Amino acid sequence: MVLFSLLLVLAAADADDRLSKKMLPIYVKEVETYSLTVKSAPKQALELKKEPVFEWLNPARNAQQGTIFLWLRNGRPAALACIFSAPNRRLPGRNINHELHALDVEKLVVKRDQYNQWKPQAGLARKQLSDATPPAAARGARLLQMRRLAQEFGGHSLDRDGKRWQLRLLPTPLYRYPAAKSGIVDGALFALMSSAGTDPEVLLLLEVKKVDGNLHWQYACGRFSDWELHVQRKDKEVFASIPSESNPFAHDPLHLYRLYQEKVVTLEGKLLARIRPKNPHVPWGEIVPVKDK
């Protein structure tokens, strides 16, 4: 029985790996449809990091599978995209979904020659961590500090039925900033995952900022789920995302976060249908089949 169970686990892992390899080229093409700049430098395109920083599965939500990409600005994460998919219930393919979040302190300018659009209205604000131990001088020691600081953050999500899911820290950062001598001299992008799967539900930036020769900690949290979210640090709530008229399924009030269904494709990448979201408060849209030529 133990051997049989192990074989089932290995078979499932192999199937997940095959799915990931088939979907990755499709996901890369999707993320390449975006062109990002910051408002102060509209002619300097942000660097798209085409190598995924994370891949995930969520068996509890219709066998979803996805990959996370970053756009960088001088080596710092400026925006994040998760392209993920799930089986379509009517067509022999998978729904392709786009989930995005602005990370730069400046407002992003996003250009995309497609039906679905993302228009952030501000940058992602940072908050001070004045009660934390001052950043160490050595880069290696600061990474250890960041890991310990990140462990102070936790929380929970509530699905549409009111079921509570615990949020836990992904121990390895999604991305570590390269060294710098001024401004943001160090930092890392972390994520909190739900117990429902391995997909990030909350983004957590921890940064070291140099001001007048002194190093200080700052942080930012970002919604990365359509569920209700609550994040605490040392038993005090520091971030929440509660569904409302201005904070619906598809975006947050400032459109830093954006989520939509884009299309239906086969595992070979053939387009079967386009999806046209009509209501930002619901997770589905109009499916427009593509006629074979």
Regions found by a protein language model. Give the residues of each.
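Bacterial N-terminal signal peptides
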Residues: 1-9
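Polybasic, proline/glycine-rich intrinsically disordered low-complexity segments
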Residues: 14-47, 57, 81-178, 200-292
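Exposed beta-strand-loop-beta-strand "reactive/processing" segments of non-cytosolic proteins
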Residues: 46-83, 173-201
